Regions:
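Metal-dependent C-N hydrolase catalytic cores
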Residues: 1-56, 103, 119-121, 126-137, ...
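Short glycine-enriched, charge-decorated loop/helix-capping segments at active-site entrances
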Residues: 70-73, 158-166
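Conserved small/polar residues in nucleotide/adenosyl-binding loops
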Residues: 193-199
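Active-site rim beta-loop-alpha module in soluble metabolic enzymes
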Residues: 94-157
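Active-site glycine-rich loop that binds ribose-phosphate moieties when present
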Residues: 17, 41, 64-67, 72-85, ...
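Gly/Ser/Thr-rich active-site loops/lids in small-molecule metabolic enzymes
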Residues: 164-176
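Short beta-strand segments
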Residues: 34-36, 59-61, 95-97, 146-150, ...
């Protein structure tokens, strides 16, 4: 349906415009694929699923994005997974690739786990392998997938404002997503890309 109207000085209005667009896509019986913005775009995208069947959220990211509030902000790029976990139709979260632990305090990790999150680092993912990771995700569920570009290693995706070494390589994520599509249905996909282009 094209771009959502983004008002750079008004996050609330921008989020309302994104939510309206995603609701229109869902009403048409299509799968919303949302590209761009910062990771807060997940908040309105997930809000748009209110009234839909429940889903399991799969996040590929370097950061947990589970801060409840920071400097008075509850709907920014550090909050979307916390806001998602509060929704009754989000049955659980698989947070995969998490490695930049400085972005969320210890209590954020404890809160995430207590609210149904399975947190897996890149090192843990590689040690267990794709199949074992997939086995940790409920089979036959509806999946909402969100990918932050910093989930990838900066050697292949340097154009992020928050590069974090030790990230995923392209084919690791591709194989994981391929396996996920064989376990259940993808009902939404959000990819966060920064404004700067990857360098070569």
């Amino acid at each position: 349906i094209g771009d959502a109207d983004i008002v750079h000085t008004d996050t609330e209005k921008s989020h309302a415009n994104i939510e309206a667009g995603v609701r229109a896509i869902l009403a048409a019986g299509a799968v919303p694929v949302v590209i761009g913005g910062d990771h807060s775009v997940n908040i309105p995208c997930i809000n748009a699923f209110d009234g839909q069947e429940p889903f399991h959220l799969v996040q590929i990211d370097a950061h947990l994005d589970f801060v409840d509030e920071r400097h008075g902000v509850r709907y920014g790029h550090g909050n979307p997974m916390r806001r998602a976990a509060e929704k009754p139709y989000v049955t659980g979260l698989s947070q995969v690739g998490i490695r930049n632990v400085s972005s969320t305090a210890r209590d954020g990790y404890e809160d995430a786990r207590s609210m149904g999150s399975d947190i897996v680092s890149v090192r843990q993912f590689r040690k267990m392998g794709v199949d074992a990771m997939l086995d940790r995700i409920p089979e036959g569920a509806r999946y909402y997938v969100t990918i932050d570009i910093d989930g990838f290693d900066p050697s292949i995706a340097a154009g992020t404002g928050t590069p974090s070494h030790g990230g995923f390589l392209y084919y690791e994520v591709l194989e994981f997503l391929d396996g996920l599509t064989r376990r259940g249905n993808i009902v939404g996909a959000v990819s966060y890309t920064h404004l700067t282009l990857p360098t070569t």
